[in-house]
């Protein structure tokens, strides 16, 4: 009932005891639930755990860095020279391989775990531990090769103008070697393949090697010079491997020119060989034939060969497709003699009474090297007599010494 109704019937209403009320909360107090408190304590425990984990990881990292440094020092000690050079033959599994040593034996060896397996290709050069023969390193392709390219500062300082005569030979060499490297689109427009190889043959001293030097000096292509006898090695298989190295190096640095001097050392006609040395030389020739057939025309690799004995070369090497152009270097005729004499003597201080036509008209068969030797000897005669001018008598004496000197007559000691 309400307070007014109670008063009407004479009953006083109950008074509210304000002392029993709780005091009001201050405005600055926040009611924190128990869920938030639990979350806070959980996060604090997780933070403490993460800090412990961080300290543990830092300590473990320091230990691993020490182990890595120790392992690197151990690898350096293992890979320290001297090491044995071998050849990778076949991978057995991830940790073992078969390698060949320079002694001709094959070994089943362990492979260092840190080596990049992508570099281990059949035929690549590897380094073997001296005692265990374990494969500890992969060598660069040219590390054990004796075949080197001529650096720009090593190229001979010879131009075509320094070679007297040989106009036709110069033109043929430039058409077969230089033109395909500099203007290969001409052959594509005509629809023909450029020559792959050139054979220069003729008597000694007729300018074959000198013309090859001029080609090396006047082209921007990489130039690789080898002598045929370099391919003949002591151990079986070394010669064919060197042939492969030459053509591999030429392909990697194309456009390039390979000049093989004295090719008759390895390219004589094949026969029924009775000795191991003869069979090895024939294997070198077979590898050379295979490489000349195998390299792609687009690699811009040209081959120049020189020999004094073209009649002894194997017919398989001379066929078109391998050596497309054969250039003869004969003994100089009268016109060529005049050009050679003029070229060589252009750098000499000759007397006004010297008439080179006198020596040009002589019928003796002499080569360009003989003419150069005559002029050099004439200069030495002038030096001997303390003169700065070469006289006619100097050239005459030099001509007799070089051309008409009897091998059993040593006039120097008379």
Curated annotation (Swiss-Prot):
Subcellular location field: Cytoplasm; Nucleus
GO molecular function, one term: proteasome-activating activity
Chief location category: cytoplasm
Protein keywords: ATP-binding, Cytoplasm, Nucleotide-binding, Nucleus, Proteasome
Pfam families recorded: AAA (PF00004), AAA_lid_3 (PF17862), Prot_ATP_ID_OB_C (PF16450)
PROSITE patterns tied to this protein: AAA
Annotated residues for binding of ATP: 202-209
Gene Ontology terms: cellular component: cytoplasm; nucleus; proteasome regulatory particle, base subcomplex
InterPro entries: 26S_Proteasome_ATPase, AAA+_ATPase, AAA_lid_3, ATPase_AAA_core, ATPase_AAA_CS, NA-bd_OB-fold, P-loop_NTPase, Prot_ATP_ID_OB_2nd
Family affiliation: Belongs to the AAA ATPase family.
Identification of the protein by name: Probable 26S proteasome regulatory subunit 6B
Organism from which the protein derives: Caenorhabditis elegans
């Amino acid at each position: 009932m309400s307070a007014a109704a109670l008063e009407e019937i004479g009953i006083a209403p109950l008074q509210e005891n304000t002392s029993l009320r709780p005091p009001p909360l201050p405005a600055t107090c926040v009611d924190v639930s128990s869920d938030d408190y639990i979350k806070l304590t959980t996060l604090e425990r997780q933070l403490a755990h993460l800090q412990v984990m961080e300290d543990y990881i830092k300590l473990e990292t320091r230990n691993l860095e020490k182990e890595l440094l120790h392992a690197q020092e151990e690898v350096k000690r293992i890979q320290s020279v001297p090491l044995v050079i071998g050849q990778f033959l076949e991978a057995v599994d991830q940790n073992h391989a078969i390698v060949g040593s320079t002694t001709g034996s094959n070994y089943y060896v362990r492979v260092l775990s840190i080596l990049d397996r992508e570099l281990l290709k059949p035929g690549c050069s590897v380094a073997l531990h001296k005692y265990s023969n374990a494969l500890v390193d992969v060598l660069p392709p040219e590390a054990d090769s004796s075949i080197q390219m001529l650096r720009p500062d090593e190229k001979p300082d010879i131009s075509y103008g320094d070679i007297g005569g040989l106009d036709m030979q110069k033109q043929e060499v430039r058409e077969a070697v230089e033109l395909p490297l500099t203007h290969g689109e001409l052959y594509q427009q005509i629809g023909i393949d450029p020559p792959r190889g050139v054979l220069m043959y003729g008597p000694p001293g007729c300018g074959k090697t000198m013309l090859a030097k001029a080609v090396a000096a006047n082209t921007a292509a990489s130039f690789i010079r080898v002598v045929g006898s370099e391919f003949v090695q002591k151990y079986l298989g070394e010669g064919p491997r060197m042939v492969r190295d030459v053509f591999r190096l030429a392909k990697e640095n194309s456009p390039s020119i390979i000049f093989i001097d004295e090719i008759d050392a390895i390219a004589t006609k094949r026969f029924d060989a009775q000795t191991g040395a003869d069979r090895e030389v024939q294997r070198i020739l077979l590898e050379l034939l295979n490489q000349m057939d195998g390299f792609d025309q687009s690699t811009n690799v040209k081959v120049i060969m020189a020999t004094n004995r073209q009649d002894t070369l194997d017919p398989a090497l001379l066929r078109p497709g391998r050596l497309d152009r054969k250039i003869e270097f004969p003994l100089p005729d009268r016109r060529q003699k005049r050009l050679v004499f003029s070229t060589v003597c252009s750098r000499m201080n000759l007397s006004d009474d010297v008439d080179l036509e006198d020596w040009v008209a002589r019928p003796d068969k002499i080569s360009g090297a003989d003419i150069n030797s005559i002029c050099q000897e004439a200069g030495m005669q002038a030096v001997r007599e303390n003169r700065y001018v070469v006289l006619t008598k100097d050239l005459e004496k030099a001509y007799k010494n070089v051309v008409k000197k009897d091998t059993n007559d040593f006039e120097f000691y008379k």
